[in-house]
Structure formats: C-alpha cells, structure tokens
C-alpha cells in the first residue's frame, strides 16, 4: 500500500544524499528544503488530498546546445526543472513503488542491480555459446525514438492500473502529469508562454524511471510468456534484454523473429512511441552444415523500413561496449592515446597533468575496459601508455620502478590505477555481487561459456589485490624502501594531491624525483661499479641518501635545513605560551656537555626535551632513529645535569624525527600529542624538508661541477 502518511524516516531517507540542483519555477532550492522542518507536513497534505499545487505544475525548461548545426532544433537538449518540493515527494513515492512492485527481471535500467554488466555478459554469452554450438542466432538492437519524451500519459495510467497501484497514488501521479506546463527560456530575461505537456515523463523527476519501466513491463511480460520465442542461454529462453529504453531482441528461430519485431513495434505505436529503424541494427547468423554463415542482406522491417545488418567488419554499440558477429569486440587503447596526447600538450603545470590523468582520464577508461573480451595485452598496453605519459610530464627516467606509479598515495606511490591487475578484479567483484534471485543472472552464471570467462578473469586477477602487491613492492625495493611509512600520517602525502602554497611546478617535480629516486646521482644500476663513487672526494657510493645525509660537500646546507625545522617547532611552542630554550648548554659536574635542540617548559606539566633530526627513510626504520635520539638524553647523567640547571623540574625526552623524503613516522605520535602538533604544522615542516632536499642536491651538483671545472 503506497497511499499512506509520510513517516519522518522517509523524509530523512529522501533528503540523504540529495545533491544540490537548480531551483524550479517556485524558486525553492534543495538546500532550503533540507534546512526547514516544513516539508513533511506540507507534502503529506497534498499527497493525501490528491491535490497538485499550481506552483508544482509549472516548470521551466532550459535548452542546452549539442554538437552540430544549432539552427537544427534536434541539436538542442531540453532540461526541464520542476519544484524541489515536488521532487522530494516523488523521491519518497519512487522508493515506495519500487518496494511494492516487482517489475520483470529483464528490465535492468534504474534497477538495484548491476544491469550493465549482466546484460553485456548475457549478450556476449548468447552469441559466443551459439557460435560454439554452430547454431542459428539473431540479435536485434532497437532504438526507440525519444522514448521518455513521447510515452503517452494514458499508457502510464494503464500501467499503474495493471500493476495494482492504489487509487490515491494513481490519481496523484496522473494529476501531476496531466496538469503540467513549462516555459522555455529563449534568451536573457526572455521566455515563451506556458506550454502544456501532453505526453512524456519529466526529465530529472525521481518518479520518471519507475513510470517508464512500468509502461515497458507489459511488453516484457508479454514476450516472456509467449511460448517458443527467445534466445537460449543455459536452460532459459530469454526473448528480450532491456536497459531503460535500450532493447535487445534475442531469437534462435529466423521464422519467429519478424513476428516478434512486429509485436514490439505495435506495442510502442499504441503508447505514443515509435522505433527508429535507421538507428536500429540486427545480427543474423544462420547455421548450415555445421558452419555459421552471417546474413549480409537486410530482411527485417519496421514501418516498412529495412533494419541495417551488421557484417563481419562492423559492430554496434550497446551499453558502452561494441558487439559484432563473434560477441563483444576487444577494447582498444585508441581513445586513451588521444586523451593522453591532449593532456600532455595542454598548457598545464606538471601537478595538474598528473591530477588530470589520475582523477579523470583513467576513471573514464575503467568502464570500457570491463569487457568480456578484454585481454592482458590490452591492459598492459594501456598501462604502458599512461606510465610513459606521466614520465614525460614529470620528467622521470625510463627506469623509474613501476611501484612508484601504482602504489597508493598512502603507501608512498602516485596512486595511478594498475589496469592489468585491477580490471579483472573489478569485474570479478561485480560478478560476485550479483543478485542470485534474478533468473536471467542465474541462467547466465550456469552457462558453460560463462565459466570459461570467469576462469580467465580469475587467472588474470591473481591471488594478491593490487594495493597489497604494490605496497609490498614499495617496501622491498632498494629505491623505494621506507616510503610505505607514508601511511602513518596524512601529512606525509598531502602534497601529492595538492601542491603546497609557495611551491612552483619545479618544486613539485623535484619532490617527485626525490620520492621516486630520479634525482641524478652516479650510483645508479646502469653505471659500472667503478664509476659510482661520490664526486665530492669522500670515497663513498654516490646514492641519493649519501648526497642528502652524509656527503661533507653540502654539510652547511644540511645544518641550515635542520636549524630551520627546529626554529619552526620552537616558534610553534612559543605560540602556545610555553617557555622555550633553544640549544641550551647543560653541563654535568663530570664535564659532559649536552646541547638539545629545544627544551620546552610547560606550566604544571613535565618539561619536554625535543631533539630534531632529519633521517633517511630507507632500510633502517625511522623508529630506530627516534629511539637512538631519545637514548641520547634519557639517562642518569643528563637527568643529573638537567636537575642542576632547572631544579625541581621533571622531563620527557621526545625527539622529532622527519624522513628526508617527507615522511612523518608513527613514532612521533607521542611528541605530536605532547606539543600539540597539528596536521597542518606537520605538513608544512615536511614541505620545508622536501624543498631543502632539492636545494641540497642542487648545491652538491654545483659544487662537484665547480671542482671538476677547476681541475
């Protein structure tokens, strides 16, 4: 029973997740409605009275230009906006109707099931299984001309009665349709007179999908109940696949297909709609002597117009995938190549190009690659194209490890999607989340050809999820070991998503080079072992860690890096009202001298001895550096000296360790808690460290080149 008072929970459920949109002709916005307590009683009154207020019937339409000649009216897309209050009521009614009425399972559009996957797999399985069995098969893809705009209101009333919708709800729905008007904006400040809407469902109205599906439900039930027609999938006869107004007719018998097509055309004609024969297409393959022979001459008609036939060289598009005589066509990387060239040529900064590829180009590619015919080679080609483009945009070496690209940002990578490992796993997850009560899905998943597809996907996906695989790769590679600690704190990775204030594009690229091991040094695998020594004359391997942390050539810059971070921490502590001493000299009676970076005296709390250190975040964990630094002062000799310097004080020994590659380790959590370090402060100190690392490397390169030039 859908005609009942509205509960407060229904209002809350309808408002939850309601995205802001333009106001209707009454000027009310979604934000205004979600903030007021009026809607429940107000919309309930009009629902129970079966009355549609005049402001709800008045809508406004804006024309959005499409591609092509704008003098042609068909190249404009009308967007009609109704009252937000009415949309709220219709969201509630739509949920009630969906819960009360069970439509035919062949309709996957607007249903709570992964309909695009199921229908695509059903079509591919039908074609491939019939070809394997060398049997006749026919597929007709039908285009309904402006289906949502032309469905008659009388057919909607008929559908509501057929489905047993109660009289109160039916009267309200028919009233909201028959009394509707709209005005079309035709220029700045100008609009047409009111235009009465005599057919079609409202675009953007929450009820429209259910009403259209309700009309189509009669056709789907009629076809399913007709004996003998349909295509065989597993043990089931399936005559039609529907996704909203996208219809596919499946038929094993050539003789019955024209009759089925005529029945469908007549159904739409009686309900104010029509089939577009020129945009429809058919596949027809006859089996003769154990050989499948495609028909190349059109033989099906709609309104005396022949439907085009797909031959061996052609495909047709269905739900974003291309299908031909052999089933789903293998996806290509042509569009990806074109998109990446556009991104690379765009006048954007490096971090903007990276963000565009990661957040827009790759996600746009994901759906098209979730194709039954996808292969490992196609996915590898797509991955290689993306990696190559990112390397050029960020000026990375060809030998940059793949884990630097595919590990999650929280694991120390750039967060790109590894298509080779992700796409098969995504498809398997979608398949495993299917609704087992759907008889069409059950028929699909029991088909032998589907078992072959599933086995192939399992082999492609592997045993380890991509995120785990690449995190392990980061943790076990010489160049990237230690970056997995970026997951310890958001401050270690925030700059990858959003360039810090004051950074140039060059600063961002240099920071990426540091993370990925791309700062130029002599100690790289391609150099002979004898040519990897430091050009500063210290006789050590010229690794990035050596240059930044140990080489005496840039010792002054290292000291300035340390002092800047220590000063910033001291300034923060002073802003809290604490007394701060920087590098105090604390001498023990036996002559030992201690010079901690900062001592913070907090009123009513133990004083904090904080020594700052920038350590290389590599094979030696930063936790070990933290413990070593703590042991420097956490012993009896220092406590005796500190007690003489500050009588009556107690002390906490809490170092602050920063990773040279911008890592804030978990071991700093006690220090951060005691000294009230915010995420913003931690991030700013790490950003300073990263910029200083770039300066250190530049100074080193200048120094060694000057030395070589002088020699």
UniProtKB/Swiss-Prot annotation:
Protein keywords: Endonuclease, Hydrolase, Nuclease, Nucleotidyltransferase, RNA-directed DNA polymerase, Transferase, Transposable element
Single GO molecular function: RNA-directed DNA polymerase activity
Assigned EC number: 2.7.7.49
InterPro entries noted in UniProt: DNA/RNA_pol_sf, RT_dom
UniProt keyword ATP-binding, yes or no: no
Reaction equations catalysed: DNA(n) + a 2'-deoxyribonucleoside 5'-triphosphate = DNA(n+1) + diphosphate
Region (Nucleic acid-binding endonuclease): 444-711
EC category: transferase
PROSITE patterns: RT_POL
CDD domains noted in UniProt: RT_nLTR_like
Domain Reverse transcriptase: 45-323
Hydrolase found in the keyword field: yes
SUPFAM superfamilies: DNA/RNA polymerases
Entry protein name: Retrovirus-related Pol polyprotein from type-1 retrotransposable element R2
UniProt organism field: Popillia japonica (Japanese beetle)
Classification of source organism: Eukaryota, Metazoa, Ecdysozoa, Arthropoda, Hexapoda
């Amino acid at each position: 029973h859908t005609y009942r008072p509205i509960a407060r929970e229904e209002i809350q459920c309808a408002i939850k997740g309601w995205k802001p949109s333009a106001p209707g002709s009454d000027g009310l916005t979604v934000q205004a409605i979600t903030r007021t307590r009026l809607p429940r009683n107000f919309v309930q009154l009009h629902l129970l009275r079966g009355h549609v207020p005049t402001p709800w019937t008045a809508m406004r339409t804006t024309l959005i230009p499409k591609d092509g000649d704008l003098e042609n009216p068909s190249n404009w897309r009308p967007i009609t906006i109704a009252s937000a209050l009415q949309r709220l009521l219709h969201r509630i009614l739509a949920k009630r109707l969906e819960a009360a009425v069970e439509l035919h399972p062949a309709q996957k559009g607007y249903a709570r099931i992964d309909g695009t996957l199921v229908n695509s797999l059903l079509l591919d399985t039908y074609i491939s299984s019939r070809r394997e069995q060398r049997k006749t098969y026919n597929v007709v893809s039908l285009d309904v001309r402006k289906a949502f705009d032309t469905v008659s209101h009388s057919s909607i009333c008929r559908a509501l009665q057929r489905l047993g919708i109660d009289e109160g709800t039916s009267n309200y729905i028919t009233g909201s349709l028959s009394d509707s008007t709209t005005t079309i904006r035709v220029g700045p400040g100008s609009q047409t007179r009111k235009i009465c809407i005599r057919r079609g469902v409202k675009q953007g109205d929450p009820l429209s999908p259910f009403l259209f599906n309700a009309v189509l439900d009669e056709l789907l039930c009629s076809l399913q109940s007709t004996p003998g027609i349909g295509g065989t999938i597993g043990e089931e006869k399936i005559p039609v696949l529907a996704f909203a107004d996208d219809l596919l007719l499946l038929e094993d018998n050539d003789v019955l297909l024209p009759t089925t097509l005529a029945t469908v055309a007549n159904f739409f004609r009686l309900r104010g709609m029509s089939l577009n024969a020129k945009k429809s297409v058919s596949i027809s393959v006859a089996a003769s002597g154990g050989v499948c022979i495609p028909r190349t001459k059109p033989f099906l008609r709609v309104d005396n117009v022949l439907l085009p036939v797909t031959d061996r060289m052609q495909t047709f598009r269905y739900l974003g995938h291309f299908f031909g005589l052999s089933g789903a066509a293998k996806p290509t990387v042509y569009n990806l190549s074109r998109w990446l060239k556009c991104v690379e040529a765009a006048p954007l900064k490096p971090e903007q190009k990276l963000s565009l590829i990661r957040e827009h180009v790759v996600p746009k590619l994901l759906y098209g690659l979730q194709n039954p015919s996808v292969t490992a080679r196609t996915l590898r080609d797509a991955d290689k194209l993306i990696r190559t483009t990112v390397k050029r945009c960020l000026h990375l070496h060809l030998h940059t490890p793949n884990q630097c690209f595919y590990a999650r940002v929280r694991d120390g990578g750039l967060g790109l999607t590894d298509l080779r490992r992700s796409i098969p796993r995504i498809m398997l997850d979608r398949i495993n989340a299917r609704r087992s009560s759907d008889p069409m899905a059950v028929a699909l998943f029991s088909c032998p050809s589907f078992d072959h597809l599933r086995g192939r996907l399992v082999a492609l996906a592997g045993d380890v999820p991509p995120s785990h695989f690449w995190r392990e790769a980061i943790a076990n590679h010489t160049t990237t070991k230690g970056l997995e600690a970026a997951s310890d704190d958001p401050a270690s990775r925030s700059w990858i998503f959003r360039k810090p204030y004051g950074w140039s594009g060059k600063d961002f690229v240099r920071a990426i080079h540091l993370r990925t091991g791309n700062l130029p040094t002599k100690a790289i695998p391609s150099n002979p072992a004898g040519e990897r020594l430091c050009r500063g004359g210290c006789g050590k391997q010229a690794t990035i860690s050596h240059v930044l942390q140990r080489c005496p050539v840039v010792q002054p810059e290292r000291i300035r890096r340390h002092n800047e971070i220590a000063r910033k921490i001291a300034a923060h502590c002073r802003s809290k009202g604490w007394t701060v001493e920087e590098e105090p000299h604390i001498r023990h009676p036996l002559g030992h001298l201690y010079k901690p970076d900062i001592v913070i005296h907090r009123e009513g709390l133990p004083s904090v001895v904080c020594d700052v250190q920038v350590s290389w975040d590599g094979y030696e964990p930063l936790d070990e550096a933290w413990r070593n630094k703590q042991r420097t002062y956490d012993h009896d000799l220092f406590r005796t000296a500190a007690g003489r310097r500050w009588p009556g004080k107690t002390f906490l020994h809490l170092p602050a360790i920063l990773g040279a590659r911008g890592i804030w380790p978990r071991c700093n959590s006690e220090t951060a808690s005691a000294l009230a370090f915010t995420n913003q402060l931690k991030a700013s100190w790490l950003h300073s460290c990263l910029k200083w690392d770039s300066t250190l490397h530049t100074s080193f390169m200048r120094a060694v080149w000057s030395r070589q030039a002088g020699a």
